[in-house]
Amino acid sequence: VEDKYAMVQMLAAAIKSVYASVYYRDSKAYMTATQNVIDQEKMAVILQEVVGNAHGNHYYPNISGVLRSLNYYPIGNEKAEEGIAALALGLGKYIVDGGQTLRVSPYHPRQVLQTSELHACLRDTQNQFYALDLNQVSNDFKVDDGFNILKLGIKEAEKEQTLNFIASTYDPNDNIIRDGLYPGGRKLITFKGVLQQGVFPLPQLMQLAMKNGADAMRRPVEIEFACNINPDRTGEFCLLQIRPIVDSKQMLEEDITRIDGNRCLLRSHNSLGHGISEDVTDVVYVKMSDSYNAAENPQIVDEVDTINRKFLESR
């Protein structure tokens, strides 16, 4: 927006929308669940420049990442204190929303499980990304923080020539993956150029950010960052956020393999991590049957939401 007065009006509308979000139903439900009083809450709004470049009507960085200085699930010769990063093309909201990212240890950039085998690379690498829609300029800010964000396919980034140094090419004729961009073939987001070929010192920058961040806060940290990579192999590494990881209750000292299976309420080989919750009094169990249909998920969500509300109201 070239009109500075119009820009100020848009900025004011955006800030009002942030404050107004406190009074939405989901926000109030969170406040009730955490036993906080909304009148005692305080909020500050931080203005921050979006890292990236304009590509036609889209605006996004070449790389976004979330970096944790503590890795709860090291593989191979990785160590927990060496940290872990989740990397993606485009805006970092894609990572926060649980999109398919590349998991890599800054100290072991050549040891990437997702790209270690052909079928895994084809199956487990990013196939979409987020970008700001430069055509969406409006004072009508929405409840959804992604109302002006587009979800695009990797082919769109290929057209906009933003895959240099971060993509590889699948050759279906030889059934192999070639590092770099080649005509034809599916493009895979592997970040080989910046992780393994020294195009941009991303592993070293992540190591430095983790060390300085953890030293400054005197505890493990989580860092959000973004990078712009230029065709001449120069680039910018931008720190966006840094916050401490509260992990006092997340360290598991017990060998769970020694626990008698008959004493388990439930067991899973896929979990979200360690944690201790001492205030759980009600459990909602959704029973799955052979006739389960994923199309019924929205209805199940509504039913669970109704049950949760009854629990909150009965407190």
Where are these regions (language model features)?
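Nucleotide/phosphate-binding sheet-loop regions of phosphoryl- and nucleotidyl-transfer enzymes
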Residues: V1-R315
